[in-house]
Amino acid sequence: MNKVWLSIACSFLLLAAGALPSRAVELRIGRDALERTLKQQLFAGPNGRFYLKGTPSSACAVYADDARVTFIQDRILVKVKTRARMGKSVGGACIGISLSPQAEVSMAPYGEGESIGFRDAQLVKVSDQRELNFLLTPFLSRQVPSSMKVDAADLLRKALESSTVSSNYKVTLDRLKVHSMQIKGNTLIVDVDGDISVK
């Protein structure tokens, strides 16, 4: 994801170097970058798992892993594999049922000041088991969208700081405003404007 933000930072640097007034610029964020963000922020536990119930050492536990992000029309679809051992723990074993359904949620991207957020979460596919859905529904509709939120200004500032070392120019992002976004193919195109200083 750092390469994406470094190229974005270079775009801003070119605008600043040309002494142009603040105008809208397009940030292009690939599907893979959003998927990495989700995995880093939510699936950072042991073996890339997020435990909805229990822990890695629990006999009975429910976890999600293997998150995949795809773009469909104007929405972002997140698919996760769910593994559930539901029942009663007896002598270190889970006596009950094992389930491994795939769950899906779609959401719409939107601009939120300096950030790219996600809202209007709609459950596309969940389990047939009511007990499992009790855990999956809040996870998919709240935790997944909030974990995909990207602070664009913060990432650009970090990319600009690293460019200062190689260029000997102090480049800072003073302001960033996300206006609108749309999905084209495997890219989320974000219209932003901002101010950059070069010293």
Model regions and ranges:
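Positively charged n-region of N-terminal signal peptides that target proteins for export
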Residues: 1-5
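Short helix-onset patch at the extreme N-terminus, typifying the N->h transition
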Residues: 6-9, 30-32
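Bacterial N-terminal signal peptides
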Residues: 7-17
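Bacterial Sec-dependent signal peptides at the C-terminal "C-region" and cleavage site
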Residues: 16-24
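Extracellular/lumenal and peripheral-membrane lipid-interaction modules
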Residues: 23-199
